[in-house]
Regions:
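N-terminal secretory signal peptides
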Residues: 1-14, 18-32, 37
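Intrinsic-disorder/low-complexity regions
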Residues: 1-5, 41, 50, 174
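C-terminal segment of N-terminal export signals and the immediately downstream linker at the start
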Residues: 9, 31-61
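HIT superfamily nucleotide-processing domains
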Residues: 47-307
Length: 307
């Protein structure tokens, strides 16, 4: 069931926080979306003022956290979302309130932690910021101060990474505010089906993948891609990048969301490293979608493989 959203005078969607009645990872296992969202006015996308006082990230890492003026959209450090409780345990040792269980902290850094997803497999992990950030709608993610969480996820998930995704093809993904179940940003590190990889490479051969950022939102680079058996096709905007050195949240807003007058809170974003029989081919397919597209989707779950 979707929670109703509370309307407030904020530049973007105001989320309704979930209460942590069970372990955070357990909430990610097979349930429908629990968080509701509403369309809102244009967000504030300016860089944080130099004299603002960002909340220091737990662990005092090099990347700042969202300043106080972003808290209505990005969350407060005092929030009790289950996944944020997991961060507090991994970083500070703060035990989650019962009946939530202690998480298994697979990796910790100044900017993020990595946890098991649910179900717990060798190709289902979550990268979670140590900053309090609700999700993709947080405008701070689009600023130069934010950590590059997508590249961090890839560096861990790749073969030889600290928490490698053991699956022939890897996918990284984030759900929209409409479709996620927990109100703390998390990037799924999982598998993708061979058919997804093959479809993307076929689209590339047909020149149906944007290779310039300015073309990412163009209808000619929208393509239907089949997900799980029986789930049907979904439409995605497909871009190819040589690396993940740029902030994907910034690129998504600048080249897709803002030009079309869309809502960042309704976007899903997926990264599929190009793979061949020899391994990683040195580039990435970046897919975006939302419910403004015909047969679009607000979730990455159609393409990612968790079980």
């Amino acid at each position: 069931m979707n929670d109703p959203s509370n309307a407030r005078e904020v530049p973007r969607r105001q989320f309704v926080a979930l209460s942590g009645a069970v372990g955070a990872a357990a909430l990610l296992a097979g349930a429908g979306p629990l968080g509701g969202a509403a369309s809102a006015a244009d967000p504030a996308h300016a860089e944080s003022p130099a004299d603002s006082c960002p909340t220091s990230p737990p662990g005092a890492g090099p990347s700042p956290c969202p300043p106080a003026q972003f808290q209505p959209l990005c969350g407060k450090p005092t929030d009790k979302d289950p996944l944020w409780n997991d961060v507090q345990f991994c970083v500070h040792g703060t035990v989650p309130p019962p009946p939530q269980l202690k998480p298994n902290c697979l990796k910790m850094s100044a900017d993020y932690i990595i946890l098991h997803g649910m179900p717990e497999t060798r190709h289902n992990y979550l990268l979670v910021p140590t900053c309090r950030i609700t999700g993709i709608e947080c405008p701070f993610l689009e600023t130069s101060g934010a950590a590059n969480y997508w590249n961090d996820a890839w560096q861990n998930a790749r073969s030889g990474g600290s928490v490698p995704v053991q699956y022939p093809n890897i996918g990284l993904g984030i759900n929209s505010a409409l479709s996620r179940q927990l109100q703390q940003l998390h990037i799924h590190m999982a598998g993708v089906r061979p058919s997804t990889q093959a479809r993307l490479q076929d689209l590339e051969k047909m020149s149906r993948i944007a290779t310039q950022l300015s073309h990412w939102g163009s209808p000619q680079y929208q393509a239907a891609i089949t997900g799980a058996e029986g789930s049907g096709d979904r439409t995605y905007r497909v871009l190819k990048l040589p690396d993940l050195g740029q902030n994907l949240f910034t690129l998504l807003y600048r080249y897709v969301v803002n030009p079309a007058g869309l809502d960042m809170a309704r976007q899903t974003l997926i990264v599929v490293p190009k793979m061949t029989a020899a391994g990683f081919a040195g580039s990435f397919y970046v897919l975006s979608s939302d419910d403004s597209l015909h047969d679009g989707t607000t979730t990455c779950d159609h393409l990612l493989v968790y079980r």
